[in-house]
Amino acid sequence: MVPFFTRERFGRPQFLAGCLLLAFLAQCLWLVGKGARPGTLDVSEIYRLERGAALWQGRGSGPDANVPVPVPGLKNETDSALAPENGGYDAHHSPLWYLIASAPLHLRQVALQPENIRSLHWLAGAPFLIFGLLLGASLWYVARRLFGNAGGYIALVLYCFSPGILRASALFSAEPEGGAAWGAFGAIFTAIAVAHTLYAPREVILWNWRRILLLSLSLVLAVGSQFSLVVVVPLALAFMLYLAPTRRIAAFVIWIVACAIALLLWYASYFFHARAFWQGMVHGSFLGISWPAYTMPGAYHQVLAQLGQASPALVVALPVALITYFSWRRARYFGNTAPLLVAVLFLALAIGTPHYPGLGFQFMAVPFLFVFVAGIAADLLETRHRQITLAAILGLLVASAAWNLWELARVA
C-alpha cells in the first residue's frame, strides 16, 4: 500500500503554501474581530442566519421556511430592506446558501438576540473562512499543476493579500460569495481535469467517480449559492468537449452524470419538497442581464474600479500579462487561455448586471485572473530575462502584501 504522508504530498512547497494560508487566515480573523464590535449590526447577516435557522427547523416546509421570523429587540429592517419578493422566494439564491450560512448556528445554539451580536458574527463568518481557505488551497494546487512551483506561489500570494478576497472571506462589509467562488473555480478546473483523464484505458464512469462527485459538488455549490452561475454548467461541458475531441461521448456522459448528481443535491437543499423546489426554480433569476448596461461607459468604469479595489496588484500585473499574452505566441496556450476566457466572461456578465449578481461575478473573476497572471509570470521566468522578471515580480508581491497589511492596521 502506498503511504499517504509522502514527501511528494507534504514537502517544502506544501509547507510554504500552508504558511501563506495561515497568514491569510490570520488576516481574516483580524477582520472578523473588527467587524464583531459590540453595537454594530449587519442586518443582512442577521437575515441570513434567521432565514437559515428557519429552514433547518422547518426542514424546508411551512411558512417559517420562506418568511423570516422577527428578531426580538430589533426593528423589522429585515422585512423592509431584505425580505425577498415573489412570495418569499429568493430570486438569486437557493436554500443551500442560507443553510450553509446558518450551519454553525444549527450546530451551536445561540439565541438571535441583540446581546449576542458578537457571537453571531463569528458564527456567521465561520463557513466563509473555511471557503476562503479552500479556495486558496485550490488556487495554489491548480496554478502549481499548470505552471510549476513559481506559478503556484505567485497566484497564492496574490490571493492571500487581496483586499477583496479577505473582505469576502471575513464578511467585512461584503457579501458571502466564498462558497459560490469556490464552486465556480472547482467546476471549471475539475471539468478540465476530468477531460484530461479520458484517454486513460479504463472504464469511464468507475475510473472517474471521485472527480465526478467533485464536479457535482462544485456545480451545486456554485449554482445553489448564486443562480446566475448556471453559466458554468455549459462552460464546463465546452472545456471537456474541447480537450477530449476523440472521447466526446464519454465526456458528455460524465457531464450528464455530474449534472444529475448536482441536481439531486440541489433538490436535497429543499429537503426533498417538490413544490418548494419547483417554486424556487420558477421565481429564480438565472441570468437577468440588463442589455442597455453594455452601452453605458459608467458600467465599464465601475467594474474596472471595483476590480482594482479587490486586488490593487492586478492594476499593474494584469495589463502587463495581457500585453505579454497577445504579443508573445509562446504564452498563448490552453493553461493561460482558459482562466482568461472564464474571467472575461464573468466580467462581461458583471457589466450586464450592474448591481446583484454583478458584484458576485466580479468576485468570481478575481481567482481566475490570479491564475492567468501567475501563468504569464511563470512563462517570463523561463526566459533569458529571468533576473529582471523575478525582481519585478518580487517587488510587486512584497509591495502588495505590505500595502494590504498597512490597510489592515488602519482598520483598528
Language model segments and positions:
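Membrane-interface helix-loop-helix junctions at transmembrane boundaries of multi-pass membrane enzymes
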Residues: 8-10, 144-146, 201-209, 244-254, ...
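Short helix- or helix-capping micro-motifs
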Residues: 23-24, 155-160, 189, 219, ...
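Transmembrane-helix motifs of polytopic, lipid-linked glycan transferases
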Residues: 118, 122-146, 186, 322-327
